[in-house]
Design a protein with these regions (language model features):
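Mature extracytoplasmic/periplasmic domains
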Residues: 299, 304-364
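A structural signal for short loop-to-beta-strand junctions that line the ligand-binding cleft
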Residues: 113-117, 135-139, 144-176, 204-206
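Early extracytoplasmic/lumenal segment of secretory-pathway proteins
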Residues: 59-127
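N-terminal secretory signal peptides
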Residues: 1-32, 56-57
């Protein structure tokens, strides 16, 4: 049975402190932190003793209030920028980390998220607009956003029926990372190799996302189908493959960097920035875009309807879109940005990095996620069956 991490393994003090620092930076969710450290029900007791488990210190309120709550993805920001924002405004940035767009949507649909800003992916925005979950943006409050500076491929999805609901953050691709010391030096290049290795030499060492769009989409690519397919027969083929590989997985989890770094996992579905971070730190870990195709995506900043600290939300978006601040973000997380102003500030070697900016033939084979996949019941039910098998 797949798992998040190795079960019942005692955690060392060093590992505990590493995970605590990741939690405090917003790199991982509270649920992840409690599961990995084994605190569980002890949280209430520990809250008084462990900084980061209790509410953070209230900052002196300025014009925008004392806090801003951001829902975002793992390893997707420079914590030093948040510290600078707090110094400038008095608003403390509190980060909620999520592993899928479905989680974000469900949280907003349930009401009372408490978020002021969140980071949805391109294909979800029309759903948020249709369900009146996000508000039209007042661009006068985001003077650092200059529409003309952004590549329209990665900014157009934020505008629905002529109204801007979201502004671009980063873009990237979905491929996989593989530790080549376990391939005998062989270079991988396809999704077929990913799935076939998982069933054989990499049994027990592969991770897939806890995210239906990418896990189902990349299983569909094994058969040459569209990444976004909702065709019942094609989904049935993908389910057969997923159920076949399920016993061979190390984990179903969207936070794959720790096991790839410590060697528990040898291969995992991955996003661009994680691929770049891992390859930089451990050169034998390579990022692969399957020749069959897959996903290209763009993420956005948006403000939920009813945001409790709305002015602080606008201030944070505007701050992060300052080209100099944005450049620091890119240098930290490794995801490309569509802002030409920011790109002028980045090192040439970064702009020429094949992980971040793949060859045209690889890019041309990729698909943007389709809105239909977010709410398609067949895909949601398939993922549920896969996870419970």
């Amino acid at each position: 049975m797949s798992k998040t991490y190795k079960d019942n393994t005692p955690i060392s003090r060093q590992k505990f402190m590493e995970e605590l620092r990741r939690y405090q930076k917003g790199s991982v969710s509270r649920r992840h932190f409690l599961a990995v450290t084994g605190l569980g029900m002890a949280t209430a007791v520990m809250a008084g003793a462990v900084p980061g488990l209790r509410p953070r210190k209230t900052w002196a309120a300025g014009e925008i209030g004392d806090r801003v709550i951001l829902a975002t993805w793992p390893n997707y920001h420079d914590p030093k920028n948040f510290e600078k924002f707090t110094e400038m405004t008095g608003a403390n940035v509190q980060v909620n980390v999520f592993g899928s767009n479905e989680e974000m949507l469900a949280k907003l649909q349930a009401g009372g998220s408490g978020w002021d800003v969140f980071v949805p992916t391109n294909y979800t925005i029309t759903t948020y607009v249709g369900e009146k979950l996000i508000e039209p943006l007042d661009l006068a409050k985001i003077p650092n956003y200059e529409a003309g500076a952004f590549d329209p491929r990665f900014s157009d999805a934020g505008t629905v029926d002529g109204t801007v609901f979201a502004v671009p953050k980063n873009w990237g691709t979905t491929g996989y990372v593989v530790n080549t010391k376990h391939t005998g030096g062989k270079k991988l290049s396809t999704w077929k190799e990913f799935w076939d290795l998982t069933k054989t030499e990499f049994s027990g060492r592969t991770m897939v996302h806890d995210y239906q769009l990418t896990t189902i989409g990349n299983a569909l690519k094994y058969f040459g189908y569209s990444f976004n397919s909702v065709d019942p027969k094609e989904l049935a083929d993908a389910e057969t493959l997923l159920l076949e590989v399920k016993p061979h997985l190390y984990a179903i989890n969207s936070d794959y960097q720790p096991p790839m770094r410590n060697g528990d996992a040898w291969m995992s579905m991955a996003w661009t920035g994680d691929g770049k971070q891992l390859h930089t730190d451990i050169p034998e870990i390579e990022y692969v875009l399957g020749k069959e195709g897959g996903e290209i995506w763009s993420d956005y900043f948006a403000i939920p309807n009813g945001a409790p600290h709305r002015d602080a939300g606008y201030a944070l978006i505007n701050f992060l879109l300052d080209p100099a601040i944005n450049a620091k973000e890119v240098l930290t997380h490794g995801y490309p940005v569509a802002d030409a102003r920011t790109n002028k500030m980045l090192p040439k070697e970064l702009l020429e990095d094949p992980i971040l900016y793949p060859a045209k033939d690889l890019l041309d084979a990729l698909e943007f996620g389709a809105a239909a996949t977010l709410t398609d019941p067949n895909r949601a039910e398939l993922l549920a069956r896969f996870k419970s098998a």
